[in-house]
Regions:
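Membrane-helix interface segments
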Residues: 6-9, 31, 65-73, 98-99
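Interfacial helix-loop-helix junctions of multi-pass membrane proteins
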Residues: 31-39, 83-106
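Residue-level signature of the transmembrane alpha-helical core
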Residues: 15, 40, 47, 56, ...
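Short, motif-level signal for alpha-helix interfacial/capping segments enriched in acidic residues
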Residues: 23-28, 62-67, 76
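Membrane-interfacial alpha-helical segments at the cytosolic side of multi-pass membrane proteins
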Residues: 49-64, 107-120
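"…centered on the first transmembrane helix and the immediately adjacent amphipathic helix/loop
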Residues: 1-59
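Small-polar-interrupted transmembrane alpha-helices in polytopic inner-membrane proteins
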Residues: 14-23, 71-90
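Membrane-interface capping segments at transmembrane-helix boundaries
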Residues: 118-128
């Protein structure tokens, strides 16, 4: 695979997800925000999208960085983007940026980081054959 194609396949997905998050953040607030299940769904979405974003950044960075640095960079990018996303929402009519959303986003990124570390830190089991 050529280097430009490889870079696009690695960096394209996290950048595309960030663009999607930005687009959703630019939408004005709707009126049913006080319905409990809509509130819950949005918080689960915050957690999930940033968990996915962290995993995608890890995937993009793992060949260039050691495991711990790739995981930390993924979390760092996610938290920084969560902060800027909430700041962006303060500029949109009917939207407010909140620190608790940043914390939910960070929790999603940290959950993904924990799963990634757990997955890549486990020793590979070698199947023993008995002859």
């Amino acid at each position: 695979m050529s280097k430009p194609v490889r870079l696009l396949t690695l960096w394209g997905p996290p950048v595309a997800l960030m663009a999607l998050i930005f687009a959703f953040s630019a939408m004005p607030s709707d009126s049913d925000k006080h319905v409990w299940w809509v509130f819950l769904l949005r918080k689960v979405a915050h957690f999930s999208e940033y968990a996915l974003l962290c995993a995608l950044w890890f995937r993009a960075l793992r060949d260039a960085l050691p495991l711990d640095r790739a995981v930390a960079a993924g979390v760092g990018i996610c938290v920084a983007y969560a902060v800027t996303d909430e700041l962006h929402q303060t500029l949109v009519d009917g939207r407010i940026g909140t620190w608790h959303d940043v914390l939910i986003d960070a929790a999603g990124a940290l959950a993904a980081a924990w799963l990634i570390r757990r997955r890549y830190s486990q020793p590979r089991s070698v199947a023993s054959s008995t002859a």
